[in-house]
Curated annotation (Swiss-Prot):
Binds as a heterodimer with protein bS6 to the central domain of the 16S rRNA, where it helps stabilize the platform of the 30S subunit. PANTHER family: 30S RIBOSOMAL PROTEIN S18, SMALL RIBOSOMAL SUBUNIT PROTEIN BS18M. This is Small ribosomal subunit protein bS18. It comes from the Bacteria. Keywords: Ribonucleoprotein, Ribosomal protein, RNA-binding, rRNA-binding. Part of the 30S ribosomal subunit. Forms a tight heterodimer with protein bS6. It holds the Pfam family Ribosomal_S18. One of its GO terms (biological process) is translation. Residues 1-25 are annotated as: Disordered. GO terms for molecular function: small ribosomal subunit rRNA binding; structural constituent of ribosome. Belongs to the bacterial ribosomal protein bS18 family. The lineage of its organism: Bacteria, Pseudomonadati, Acidobacteriota, Terriglobia, Bryobacterales. GO terms for cellular component: cytosolic small ribosomal subunit.
Amino acid sequence: MAESKGRPGSASQRPTGGDKAIAGQKKQYFRRKKVCRFCVEKIDDINYKDVKMLHAFVAERGKIVPRRISGVCAPHQRRLTDAIKKARNIALLPFAASF
């Protein structure tokens, strides 16, 4: 009877620390570091009139793609954001996705 009064997760049913060590040995995949496209091509000026290039950095919903996804460095991301905003203001790029 004393065994039936125990809680369902009693110490005898818990996994030991050795199980965690085995489970923690997952295969680690090599993630290639993203390099800034503008730094590689040595582009200093991001032109707001180059819609084809800017469109690659705008998601299908109309949002600007973040740095961690696009791989652009911080200075170029700031210039890219300014160029996309200028292109939106003169109606070269949409503010939102068309439904």
